[in-house]
């Protein structure tokens, strides 16, 4: 079973491998940027992902609560 902390680390590792820049904002959010794309992942403590938003050119595109969808966004 994967814990939330492992999930957060797993997303951070994947983002790094794929060339994304990661910034931690307020200890609760991870912001990934690559070119004009930004992904913001909000965490409820370190226990679970609250949700994530995808932006292109600072325009909101999509929202999810599914870590697998965030992985797909990072792989684009």
Model-predicted segments: where are they?
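Catalytic cores of nucleic-acid endonucleases
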Residues: 71-73
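Amphipathic, interaction-prone secondary-structure segments
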Residues: 18-47
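Intrinsically disordered, low-complexity regulatory segments enriched in Ser/Thr/Pro
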Residues: 39-65
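Negatively charged, low-complexity tracts enriched in Asp/Glu with abundant Ser/Thr
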Residues: 1-29, 59-68
């Amino acid at each position: 079973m994967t814990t939330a902390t492992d999930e957060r680390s797993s997303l951070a590792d994947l983002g790094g491998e794929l060339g994304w820049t990661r910034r931690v904002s307020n200890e609760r959010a991870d912001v990934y940027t690559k070119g004009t794309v930004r992904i913001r992942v909000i965490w409820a403590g370190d226990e679970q992902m609250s949700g994530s938003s995808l932006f292109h050119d600072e325009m909101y595109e999509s929202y999810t609560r599914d870590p697998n969808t965030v992985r797909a966004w990072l792989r684009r």
